Swiss-Prot record:
Annotated protein name in UniProt: NADH-quinone oxidoreductase subunit D
Record-linked InterPro entries: NADH_Q_OxRdtase_suD (IPR001135), NADH_UbQ_OxRdtase_49kDa_CS (IPR014029), NDH1_su_D/H (IPR022885), NiFe-Hase_large (IPR029014)
Organism expressing this protein natively: Herminiimonas arsenicoxydans
Gene: nuoD
Lineage of source species: Bacteria, Pseudomonadati, Pseudomonadota, Betaproteobacteria, Burkholderiales
Function: NDH-1 shuttles electrons from NADH, via FMN and iron-sulfur (Fe-S) centers, to quinones in the respiratory chain. The immediate electron acceptor for the enzyme in this species is believed to be ubiquinone. Couples the redox reaction to proton translocation (for every two electrons transferred, four hydrogen ions are translocated across the cytoplasmic membrane), and thus conserves the redox energy in a proton gradient.
SUPFAM superfamilies for this protein: HydB/Nqo4-like
Length: 417
């Protein structure tokens, strides 16, 4: 009798559900996955090596391009690592701005994840809803930095500039009449803080809409419940962090366990799952959006009542103001020196980690006293998650592999680096 062999199938890297350039080699017994072998490196851009040839400040934009849907959180870990080595005091207002934008970034990431995950599983509508809200948050990025994605807004010692007093207005065009423009500009009459506050008031209703579409949806539950189950012990052993770890029932969040910036002054809860399956991870992330909204509300209130500096007063790191630079020769020389040679960091090493939307994102820097890092190592949260794909997918059908890749929230920019 003929021997029945397992079938090998290439999944990706052009597959629409592959989340970028994921290539999986699947070993199948019929339609059941026996082994899932992820092949990485198709988006490798040598970020860690490039940082060794750039000044500390010039590497900030590289951080945006690691996990390119959670831009400012990547920058945050990097600048915190530099600040540790320089013993820099960051003004309180800058810390609140950073935390507010970290949480805006978390919502941006989770909206992208929710829309893409639902689309992979077959729910088209949620994708369109999620992108409606992302527009407003992208406008916040644009208001502070001029860019809708790669902001490069954080700086060692603070942030690039204070929050603007006015929001840009939409103008009438061929594709939009005056009535539509007035509707778009309704909540743009005040400052950026007014715009963000208006968003935080509307957002809980939007999250309820997503839950109405998905949470009790029979097909959604059939596709997610009991799929990709990871026990708490295995989640810890495999190095899972973020929603992947909390979905398995372990309450570990750097914002609570190792508070950085002003998280210890804010009131929020950490959602935790019970079953460790795709459905629990979905519920954890949806609740995280609500908690992020709470944090943003508190930051807006504090920032409104406490004006102040947003950059350290250590001028070995902080450039002079534009006004001084254009009226004073010494300040111009100072500015030129900071942006050509850059500041020198004392010999030493530092690791700083943030609670990134995907897990623990860490940057380990080693300095030899020069104006460039001797070595930079990035701890990408998605890397251990992708490593666990083989264990999570074993025994499931091919269709479930798509669900499991979706629940891991994989972005290859940070995995391949």
């Amino acid at each position: 009798m003929a021997e029945i062999k397992n079938y090998t199938l290439n999944f990706g890297p052009q597959h629409p559900a592959a989340h970028g350039v994921l290539r999986l080699v699947l070993e199948l017994d019929g339609e059941v996955i026996q082994r899932a072998d992820p092949h990485i490196g198709l988006l490798h851009r040598a970020t860690e090596k490039l940082a060794e040839q750039k000044t500390y400040l010039q590497s900030v934009p590289y951080m945006d391009r690691l996990d390119y849907v959670s831009m400012m959180c990547n920058e945050h870990a990097y600048v915190m690592s530099i600040e540790k080595m320089l013993n820099l005091e960051v003004p309180l207002r800058a810390q609140y701005i950073r935390v507010m934008f970290d949480e805006i970034t978390r919502i941006l990431n989770h909206l992208m994840w929710l829309g893409a995950h639902a689309l992979d599983v077959g729910a088209m509508g949620v994708f369109l809803y999620a992108f409606r809200e992302r527009e407003d948050l992208m406008d916040c990025y644009e208001a502070v930095s001029g860019a809708r994605m790669h902001a490069a807004y954080y700086r060692p010692g603070g942030v690039y500039r204070d929050l603007p007093d006015a929001m840009p207005q939409h103008k009438a065009s061929i594709i939009r009449n005056a009535k539509a423009i007035n509707k778009l500009n309704e909540n743009r009459q005040g400052s950026l803080l007014d715009f963000i506050e208006d968003f935080t008031n509307r957002f809980p209703t939007y999250v309820d809409e997503y839950e109405t579409l998905l949470t009790d949806n029979r097909i959604w539950k059939q596709r997610l419940v009991g799929v990709g189950v990871v026990s708490p012990e295995r989640a810890m052993a495999m190095g899972f962090t973020g929603p992947m770890l909390r979905g398995s029932g372990i309450e570990w969040d750097l914002r609570k366990k190792q508070p950085y910036e002003v998280y210890d002054l804010l009131d929020f809860d950490i959602p935790v799952g019970t079953n460790g399956d795709c459905y629990d991870r979905y519920l954890v992330r949806v609740e995280e959006m609500r908690q992020s909204n709470r944090i943003i509300k508190q930051c807006v209130e504090w920032l409104r009542n406490n004006p102040g500096s947003v950059m350290t007063d250590n001028h070995k790191v902080a450039p002079p103001s534009r006004v001084d630079m254009k009226s004073n020769m010494e300040d111009l020389i100072h500015h030129f020196k900071l942006f050509t040679e850059g500041f020198h960091v004392p010999v030493g090493e530092a690791y700083a980690a943030v609670e990134h939307p995907k897990g623990e994102f860490g940057v380990y820097l080693i300095s030899d006293g020069a104006n460039k890092p001797y070595r930079m190592k990035i701890r990408a949260p998605g890397f251990p998650h992708l490593q666990g794909l083989d264990e999570m997918a074993k025994g499931h059908m091919i269709a479930d592999a798509v669900t499991i890749i979706g629940t891991q929230d994989i972005v290859f920019g940070e995995i391949d680096r």
